[in-house]
């Protein structure tokens, strides 16, 4: 199906940290129907995320940090276990994720592998996230001082099978982290896959 967007009107609703717009537009389908729609769109820029993994040790590095939206939506502590991530600041996704890995985990990773791109909440948010992975080694740990400004971050290194168990039992609820761990299960730790019985 193809659609055509016409008569777009945009109204700025908020410009605090990011921009919230209200769009009014006509949506025409290839069958000839036309419907006026109104949508609020939150523009927070694009981001990047990375899974640090050590195949030999069978471990991954995640971070735990306070996330107010999760607190508002029922996470009693507001703390979220997740993969390192950050917003692009007029730099490339690769440069962004190297910087974020250093700032949030203390690991200096040079060789990063781009895995894929995904819109994380396309019903209302513009953000496109670039997903990466990098193999880490203990000698790449440059500092234990992590986080910038007012971030509350703890670095968590754990066995890969424990991370998968935390997805299954609900201790890991972050979408990007679940996607990265499942990718790693298929591509980096295939022995963790359980054979299906017929």
From Swiss-Prot:
Highest taxon in the source lineage: Bacteria
Tell me the residue numbers annotated for binding Mg(2+) 1.
85, 104
Catalytic reaction annotation: GDP-alpha-D-mannose + H2O = alpha-D-mannose 1-phosphate + GMP + 2 H(+)
Name the keywords, alphabetized.
Hydrolase, Magnesium, Metal-binding
What Enzyme Commission number(s) apply to this enzyme?
Answer: 3.6.1.-
Q: Recorded GO terms, molecular function?
A: hydrolase activity, acting on acid anhydrides, in phosphorus-containing anhydrides; metal ion binding
What are the names of the required cofactors? Mg(2+)
Quick one: which residues bind Mg(2+) 2? Answer: 100, 104, 151
Endpoints of the signal sequence: none
Alphabetized SUPFAM superfamilies for the sequence: Nudix
Is Nucleotidyltransferase one of the keywords?
A: no
Function, as annotated, reads:
Nucleoside diphosphate sugar hydrolase that hydrolyzes GDP-mannose as its preferred substrate, yielding GMP and mannose-1-phosphate.
Domain characteristics, as noted in the entry: In the dimer, the N-terminal domains are swapped between the two monomers, such that residues of both chains contribute to the active site.
Q: Which NCBIfam families does the UniProt record give?
A: nudix-type nucleoside diphosphatase, YffH/AdpP family (TIGR00052), PRK15009.1 (NF011585)
* The name this protein goes by in its record: GDP-mannose pyrophosphatase
The source organism is Yersinia pestis
- This protein's gene is called nudK
């Amino acid at each position: 199906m193809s659609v055509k967007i016409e008569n777009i009107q945009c109204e700025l609703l908020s410009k605090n940290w990011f921009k919230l717009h209200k769009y009014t537009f006509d949506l025409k389908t290839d069958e000839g129907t036309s419907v006026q729609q109104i949508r609020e769109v939150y523009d927070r820029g694009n981001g990047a995320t990375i899974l640090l993994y050590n195949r030999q040790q069978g471990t991954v590095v995640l971070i735990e940090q306070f996330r107010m939206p999760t607190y508002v939506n029922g996470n009693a502590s507001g703390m979220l276990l997740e993969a390192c991530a950050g917003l692009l600041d007029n730099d490339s996704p690769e440069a962004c994720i190297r910087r974020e890995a250093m700032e949030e985990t203390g690991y200096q990773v040079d060789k990063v592998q781009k895995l894929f791109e995904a819109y994380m909440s396309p019903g209302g948010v513009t953000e496109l996230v670039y997903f990466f992975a990098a193999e880490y080694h203990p000698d790449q740990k440059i500092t234990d001082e992590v986080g910038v400004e007012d971030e509350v971050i703890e670095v968590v290194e754990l066995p890969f099978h424990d991370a998968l168990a935390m997805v299954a039992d609900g201790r890991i609820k972050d979408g990007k982290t679940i996607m990265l761990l499942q990718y790693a299960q298929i591509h980096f730790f295939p022995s963790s896959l359980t054979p299906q019985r017929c």
